[in-house]
């Protein structure tokens, strides 16, 4: 600012400012009065007059328009040099607002204007005689029919409720013409109207409307509506400096509109707001830079506060309505605490790359509790989702856990099985305590250990049976039957009822220290029930043959059983399919895999009850043999059992008695001597 004394905005005392203004502006006082009068001339000469301030301002780049400064300072100080005319008791402005006379020249009553000119924008734009009557001033204008406002009329304007109501309606009429709407009469809050775009365009093209807005602001301050001034000025500062929607109004808003506010505190707030949003700030000439930097406004008005209210109230489907209310501003009372923290872009949630399916599923469930998310899944559905995700990411060669549907099928198959109390109790506890979708992964036995075990068992059988063809054929049949569910060298591992891994492949020989299975015994051969594992199966036993109690390993399955044989319920692994069975062969319910079928069973044969693993069936037993209920694994099908085979007692450990050893030696010798096929 070149001359801060001509503006009392930042002065401590108004009287000192007036003295300084008289001292520094003594030479230009008359010219300032003439410019003030010329600023409110008749509208017929408004357009040429509006071009002169802009050309004058362009020649004063980097400095302030002092003519506007003096004009507004004179208005704020109530025209100290103005000599009021003798009106002889005439009050034309009061008569017009009382709807007693028409405005001149060629005018109409005020009620006609307020009621019929609301949407007639062409008439409001082209008629240049009504504005001096709607918003009278104490300054004379070019329309000599419109008389200046007197102090007596000012007092009546302020005291008459009827006149105040019409004055507010006239203010709303002109706001609508400019694309603005009055939102609150009490505070003076204004905002964009629905048709603001077209009206703003007209406001940019027709610069004489800037003079009309200056007159409106001055008249509001004169006639007791000062609280309407600051919100309207704030609106234009936002539109010109922040949104840059009204470039044709920008200079007038800085030179005239801001300094039409008579309240010094509000005026300082507006100047500081303009300084904050003016670019470049170093060229701001409407206030002292040092005082603007030190100034701390009591309320921090935010230029986009009106837009936030529009977003809250406006309908989302109406772009005109959204745009019309985007520039809403607040009055002095509403500007306190109006600051708003802009919401930046929200960062996207980053999921760790090494997160497994369980962590990702938990993240999905945690994110599902938001407002726009579906309801959280039940525990059962959550576990199913986890199981499906783990199955998708599991390699195809790796066996996956049992699903809930598979466990349910197993439970249904077990309903008809006659299990022992110990196995039923153990299986029920372990199945009930295990989650359906979280079965224990099976651990396969090393291939080398399994091959060594099979070779050792085979050697035991070969030593007992010699080089007889019967033993060789029986071993071949046993290997063929055992290899059908799982190929040799790739044994199939399964799960028992209580989740313990068990071998489904048939064992070819007993462990060391356990009695081997006799073969080729002419007498009846009772088969003992299986212990932890089934005993090996005898082959070609024409007569009854007592068998010792089984040890930890299962007995191999016999073949060619002429008599019928009811099969007990299967364990976790299936029995082989029956073939060449002339007699009836009832099959027990299947557990995890189908039970093996007996082959060539012409006569009935009861089987003994199984232990933890099923006893393999003896071969070539001509007599009937009762079948007992299966344990954890199914009993393999017997074959060629001509005589009855009563079942002996079951033991988990091999028999150590001397009788069993002697009986075994006798059987081995008899089988070696007899060369029966």
Curated annotation (Swiss-Prot):
The alphabetized list of GO BP terms reads:
regulation of cell growth
The short sequence motif called Bipartite nuclear localization signal sits at: 267-283
Gene Ontology cellular component annotations, sorted alphabetically: cytoplasm; membrane; nucleus
Superkingdom assignment:
Eukaryota
The name of this protein is Opioid growth factor receptor
Annotated region (Disordered) at 1-63, 295-407, 421-677
Compositional bias of kind Polar residues: 54-63, 421-431
What's this protein's family per the entry?
Answer: Belongs to the opioid growth factor receptor family.
Keyword Cytoplasm in record = yes
Acetylation keyword on record: yes
| Residue segments, region 7 X 20 AA approximate tandem repeats of [ST]-P-S-E-T-P-G-P-[SR]-P-A-G-P-[AT]-[GR]-D-E-P-A-[EK] | 517-656
The segments carrying the sequence repeats are: 517-536, 537-556, 557-576, 577-596, 597-616, 617-636, 637-656
Q: Output compositional bias ranges, type Low complexity.
A: 466-476, 528-538
Q: Which residue windows does the record flag with biased composition (Acidic residues)?
A: 1-29
The Swiss-Prot or TrEMBL record annotates one GO molecular function as: opioid growth factor receptor activity
Tissue expression remark: Highly expressed in the heart and liver, moderately in skeletal muscle and kidney and to a lesser extent in brain and pancreas. Expressed in fetal tissues including liver and kidney.
What would be the name of the gene that encodes this protein?
OGFR
Native species: Homo sapiens (Human)
Which of the residues bear the PTM Phosphoserine?
A: 299, 315, 349, 361, 378, 382, 403, 420, 484, 537, 557, 617, 637
Biased composition of type Basic and acidic residues is found at 305-323, 331-345, 361-395
